[in-house]
Amino acid sequence: MYQTTAALRSAFLEFFRSNGHQVVDSSSLVPGNDPTLLFTNAGMNQFKDVFLGMDKRSYTRATTAQRCVRAGGKHNDLDNVGYTARHHTFFEMLGNFSFGDYFKEDAIRFGWTFLTEVLKLPKERLCVTVYQTDDEAFEIWNKKIGVAAENIIRIGDNKGAPYASDNFWQMGDTGPCGPCTEIFYDHGDHIWGGRPGSPEEDGDRFIEIWNIVFMQYNRQASGEMLPLPKPSVDTGMGIERIAAIMQGVHSNYEIDIFRALIAKAAEIIGVTDLSNKSLRVIADHIRSCAFLVADGVMPSNEGRGYVLRRIIRRAVRHGNKLGATEAFFYKLVPTLIEVMGDAAKGLADTQVIVEKALKAEEEQFARTLERGLGILDSALNELQGDTLDGETVFKLYDTYGFPVDLTADVCRERNIIVDEAGFEAAMAEQRSRAQAAGNFGADYNAALKIDAETAFCGYSELTGNAKVTALYLNGESVPAINAGDDAVVVLDVTPFYAESGGQVGDKGVLVAQGIEFAVSDTQKFGQASGHKGTLTAGSLSVGQVLEAKVDKKLRHRTQLNHSVTHLLHAALRQVLGTHVTQKGSLVDPERLRFDFSHFEAVKPAELKQVEELVNTQIRRNHELKVAEMAIDEAKEKGAMALFGEKYDAQVRVVTMGDFSIELCGGTHVGRTGDIGLFKITSEGGIAAGVRRIEAVTGAAAMAYVAQQQAQLEEAAALLKGDTQSVVAKLKVQLDKMKQLEKDMQQLKDKLAAAASADLAGDAVVVNGVNVLIKKLEGVEAGALRGLQDELKQKLKSAVILLGVAQEGKVNLIAGVSNDLVGKVKAGELVAMVAAQVGGKGGGRPDMAQAGGSQPENLDAALSQVLPWITERLA
């Protein structure tokens, strides 16, 4: 019973569902609306605003099977993955949560009941820990649950600071925190290790399987602990650890999920030793990489994308170590989908894009991997001591794409340490890229906090009376503001849409007798809408009743652009494929910008098809239907969700005929015909696997078409024709240009042949070899190659160096006859000269080219060439 990981997941969720908990889907690995986190790393992340009192849900009890990643940032397990039994970059955290509902006693009882009655773990194999001062938890365990006092261990501050304890949980430097109690499983005395709190606690005998956090405080940047609005509960149980216990194995890598992935990786690569640690690394890394791509992260050189790149490249390196000779990593995705079962639904939906992203990154890295490993191997073989210098580490990073932890991984296998300080010094000028991943450490509490709620009436009304409930000046709450003040006004109800889902906030005015507040933007602050702007007349106090007036023209134009993004999204999926998902958008009154997943430039014919499809739906004049429904019902209807957004149990669904259905809280037109016209203005790539379309609608689209028509008419006039003949006349002109270029090249070749005859006479003989060093005047840089070829034919055994200085630049070419390349190499010759004229270059031993930016140094540089050649011909 409950032998498979999938069965355990189902049993856990069903147990808590039957105890009054709402089963909530795993949130994205990219945390929504939380600047303090790089990745979702705990089950409670998606409920952080609920714990802080900034968000409300329709339920007070929840249970989840949350996908988590710990790699990069503060929570980073990457270096240990593959070398220990329980470290992973990706794991599933089973959790149950109480938002001001039950507290310590029920939380403890739920955990104990599930482990001992549902899973039937022997009670004698379990012991628990509590925070040193948490007498309440101790008493519950001892008196209510019946755990003997000797099996309840108090853990104090053991990490060098107040509240720095294994039994005091905090997500970061700020945010929700509180004491916790943990349940440990004893694997038996045949495994080394001691109970928690003992000198041998780091052994593998006693393993933590359940952690219950009593969420009582919100830690400020100052260190102050403020009580949360309602005491809450956050629990977590790693599914991999409990699966190992239920399946009778000690290492997480021996459970069903990992056995299947390891076996498949071994089959693809051709490995027979299934205990190889590199297979463990690969099996772990495919989980984090595949789910990260599925959640919208693409390999890049900054932020989350760079962490993903590091993980992929570490896996590829381990595959290379096992003998992989071609792309293998992406081939594990189907097996991953199969073994993850219901937890892989989102991954299955994006399988095509995930496989393409992983394959593209693997193939890109493969081009430099072998050479980089060769350089690293040589450096390690020549190393005296046990430390690899930072310069070599930087070279591998900068030239061959080796993340530092990949180099450290190789060094670790040979008991070599990496000079990280030296590496940091070497890449100081490029640190901005690598530091992007650290920019997620912003103080979550630094943003303006508004403890109020604003009702939104702007779906149906653009004007309405409202009462001022709060005023903020320079980030501080104030009772009143005066004319000229830039402030934030909070109302009890508003028709102003607050920026969300890519749609910009409304503009307009708030007015009363003698009072006018010009709203330049509307933003969300928790449950409140903040109207940002300037008081242009009068004075304004909390409690004042105003008339709120949205700028109707701006709202209308914004609605055109928002509604058409839904049509565009659906059209892209029809034309390019269902792997297309929205990665972001910007909708304002002037234009729309739509980012989406796709692995190549959209072909002109495809763009035309998308545009025509959208305009067809506009002409069909579909009525936009809006409905409130449960999120599960919306998903069953096929509603598309917006990337990065968080959704409650009840959602708003916008439908346009049978063409588009999306979850959306934004404002829209009444019918698609209101959009009038849709015109794409640009398409391009913004990141690996992410494309961007910019477009206009309505009057802006008409103006764009008129501008294009005017340019076409101007071109027709220049070509002395009409708009119908522009293409034909351009083809004629292009054909003429091609013929002129051909004629010109033939003339240049004749001139080069004539010039070479004259130049050949300037050669000097050095040890029986013709040497020609010449600065040329009136010769185009493009003619150097042909001239050099002519001279080599005439001079036979020769070394040639020609230079041209024009328009502030230097062009160089070196040629060496085949009989001399053993003594003089053209690449070395041209590089020597280029270095003296502010440039660089290279090429083959018999021919090489270079450029420079210091023509004033060319004469001096050429004067050194003859001695340099003479020395090598001696």
UniProtKB/Swiss-Prot annotation:
Subcellular location as annotated: Cytoplasm
Cofactors, names only: Zn(2+)
Record's keyword annotation contains Protein biosynthesis: yes
Protein biosynthesis found in the keyword field: yes
EC number: 6.1.1.7
Binding-site residues, Zn(2+): 562, 566, 664, 668
Protein's GO biological process: alanyl-tRNA aminoacylation; negative regulation of DNA-templated transcription
Principal location class: cytoplasm
GO cellular component: cytosol
PROSITE patterns, per the entry: AA_TRNA_LIGASE_II_ALA
Keyword annotations: Aminoacyl-tRNA synthetase, ATP-binding, Cytoplasm, Ligase, Metal-binding, Nucleotide-binding, Protein biosynthesis, RNA-binding, tRNA-binding, Zinc
Catalysis: reaction(s): tRNA(Ala) + L-alanine + ATP = L-alanyl-tRNA(Ala) + AMP + diphosphate
Coiled coil: none
Highest taxon of source: Bacteria
Gene3D superfamilies attached to this UniProt entry: 2.40.30.130, 3.10.310.40, 3.30.54.20, 6.10.250.550, Bira Bifunctional Protein, Domain 2, Threonyl-trna Synthetase, Chain A, domain 2
EC category name: ligase
Free-text comment on the cofactor: Binds 1 zinc ion per subunit.
InterPro entries (alphabetical): aa-tRNA-synth_II/BPL/LPL (IPR045864), Ala-tRNA-lgiase_IIc (IPR002318), Ala-tRNA-ligase_IIc_anticod-bd (IPR018162), Ala-tRNA-synth_IIc_core (IPR018165), Ala-tRNA-synth_IIc_N (IPR018164), Ala-tRNA_ligase (IPR050058), Ala_tRNA_ligase_euk/bac (IPR023033), DHHA1_dom (IPR003156)
Purpose: Catalyzes the attachment of alanine to tRNA(Ala) in a two-step reaction: alanine is first activated by ATP to form Ala-AMP and then transferred to the acceptor end of tRNA(Ala). Also edits incorrectly charged Ser-tRNA(Ala) and Gly-tRNA(Ala) via its editing domain.
Homology family: Belongs to the class-II aminoacyl-tRNA synthetase family.
Domain notes: Consists of three domains; the N-terminal catalytic domain, the editing domain and the C-terminal C-Ala domain. The editing domain removes incorrectly charged amino acids, while the C-Ala domain, along with tRNA(Ala), serves as a bridge to cooperatively bring together the editing and aminoacylation centers thus stimulating deacylation of misacylated tRNAs.
Protein name stated in the entry: Alanine--tRNA ligase
Record organism: Shewanella sp. (strain MR-7)
